[in-house]
Amino acid sequence: MQKSIIITGAGRGIGAATAKTFLEAGYRVGLVGRNEDTLKAAAGDHPNSMVLVCDVGDPASVDQAFGTAMHAWGRLDVLFNNAGRGSPPKTADETDIDTWMDVVRVNLTGSFLCARAAFAIMRSQSPQGGRIINNGSVSAHAPRPGSAPYTSTKHAITGLTKSLSLDGRRYDIACGQIDIGNALTEMVEPMKTGMPQADGSIRPEATMDVAHVANSVFHMAEMPLDANVQFMTVMAPKMPFIGRG
């Protein structure tokens, strides 16, 4: 039976690379994001792709997107909760409340709303079950300077992952988290020229091909439901994570 996955933040970067990997593997792929043009570019003309324009922070928009996919497919096997955003590096006292609220809305509330929609589908479908994969970050373990909004949401994603794992047991819903470090995307490109470090210096950082992330998500998704990659860290080995700070 052909499997299906919904990928949020699928218009570019990690999401687009992951969509490409799953389409090539024969999955039906729902590409979720706010920009229809970037979603269409990522989907190409692949017959198994479905563009789902959606604001992940809006409950009605999320329900509509997941409902559209279910109407077409009748089943959802995997959710990759990937949508997220950062903010300019500032200390807590320099961070305005609108920036804080927007990062929380996308990174945390959006992940919860999409997980909630997927959980309901996976719980009610037959055969029951499915898999939710949350994009954490190495920032779920160690912060960068001036990253209070982003780091806080990524720590919270770990709590969401654990809660979904526990609540999903009786319904064969597995949940895992992939913590990614310096995959080369548009957002990470500036790291090649210089990023603030914990000692106050600005230094370039090592990066890795985003395809390694896509392949890792695929590995997690392909596990049988009696096995689960609970947490995985995929990172550029020379980036300042181990020993950061």
Positions of the model-derived regions?
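Substrate-binding pocket helix/loop in short-chain dehydrogenase/reductase
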Residues: 90-92, 96-104
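Conserved glycine-rich cofactor-binding loop
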Residues: 11-13
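C-terminal helical subdomain
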Residues: 177-178, 196-242
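Conserved glycine-rich Rossmann-like NAD(P)H-binding loop of the short-chain dehydrogenase/reductase
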Residues: 25-41
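Residue(s) in the substrate-gating loop at a strand-loop-helix junction
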Residues: 137
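The beta1-alpha1 cofactor-binding region of Rossmann-like NAD(H)/NADP(H)-dependent oxidoreductases
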Residues: 54-64, 97
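Active-site helix of classical SDR
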Residues: 115, 153
